[in-house]
Amino acid sequence: MPQKYRLLSLIVICFTLLFFTWMIRDSLCELHIKQESYELAAFLACKLKE
């Protein structure tokens, strides 16, 4: 049973990150999240606005 909750938590976190990235896609080029021994880094190809 705890394994189901772990998988569900991971899915919720992934969807939350995707939604967050979609919301601020024009201003987000790099995202770093550090927590204890884990690190999440996401990089997007960004064009500088002229």
Swiss-Prot record:
Q: Relay the record's extra comment.
A: Interrupted by an IS150 element, which silences the locus in strain K12 MG1655.
Mark the transmembrane ranges: 7-24
Induction field: May be repressed by MqsA.
Q: Which residues form a coiled coil?
A: none
The family note in this entry says:
Belongs to the Hok/Gef family.
Sorted keywords for this record are: Cell inner membrane, Cell membrane, Membrane, Toxin-antitoxin system, Transmembrane, Transmembrane helix
Annotated compartments? Cell inner membrane
> Does the keyword section mention Acetylation?
no
Instruction: Please give the name of this protein.
Output: Protein HokA
Any idea what job this protein has? Toxic component of a type I toxin-antitoxin (TA) system. When overexpressed kills cells within minutes; causes collapse of the transmembrane potential and arrest of respiration. Its toxic effect is probably neutralized by antisense antitoxin RNA SokA.
Q: Which topology term describes how it sits in the membrane?
A: Single-pass membrane protein
A GO CC annotation recorded here is: plasma membrane
Q: Which InterPro entries match?
A: Hok/gef_toxin, Hok/gef_toxin_CS
A Pfam family annotated for this chain is HOK_GEF
